[in-house]
Amino acid sequence: MASIPYRTALIIGAGPGISASVARQLAAEGLTVALAARDTAKLSDLVSETGAAAFAVDATDPAAVAALFKSVGERLGEPDVVIYNASARVPGPLAELDPEAVRKSLEVSAFGGFLAVQQAAQSMVPKGRGAILLTGASASVKGFARSAAFAMGKFALRGLAQSAARELGPKGIHVAHFNIDGGV
């Protein structure tokens, strides 16, 4: 792998799967890694393994996300790379889904992504560099039965990534949305 031209990465929605694999690779490349999740206890093994720092965050709370970026900046340096990996699934038949559960799912998958991208942009634009990566799924391009809430959130996240890339790319910020299906 080519050398990564950044120093600090923040992964929001950290857990044992995709984000853990990414954290390991980034740490191996010499980046300082910040892991953010609702429950940091589940990150203790990954923190020990990679030397990453763990931060608690509710990705749907604007004040909490702003505080996360401030804390990471003060403790590790402003993140040059921000990866948004949080999502919430509410599987089931459309006619039977709890509307409030669907709303919460959308808040995590889409609104939380917006909050992360907004904070990253506020930090990166003045420097004229950085990378914002949003994890998607094939559900972001094709809905599946019994997964309406997940597809809605991933479609929205893809739209956010496309808009952010067009707005922030000319300012030196790389924005990408990539689909990863299956467990890691």
Where in this protein do the model-derived segments appear?
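Active-site loop of short-chain dehydrogenase/reductase
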Residues: 7, 78-79, 93, 124-136, ...
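Conserved glycine-rich cofactor-binding loop
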Residues: 15-16
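Conserved glycine-rich Rossmann-like NAD(P)H-binding loop of the short-chain dehydrogenase/reductase
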Residues: 31-44
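The beta1-alpha1 cofactor-binding region of Rossmann-like NAD(H)/NADP(H)-dependent oxidoreductases
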Residues: 56-67, 99
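Substrate-binding pocket helix/loop in short-chain dehydrogenase/reductase
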Residues: 93-94, 101-106
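A short, exposed helix-loop element centered on a Lys and neighboring polar residues
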Residues: 117-118, 162
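Catalytic loop of short-chain dehydrogenase/reductase
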Residues: 131-156, 162, 169
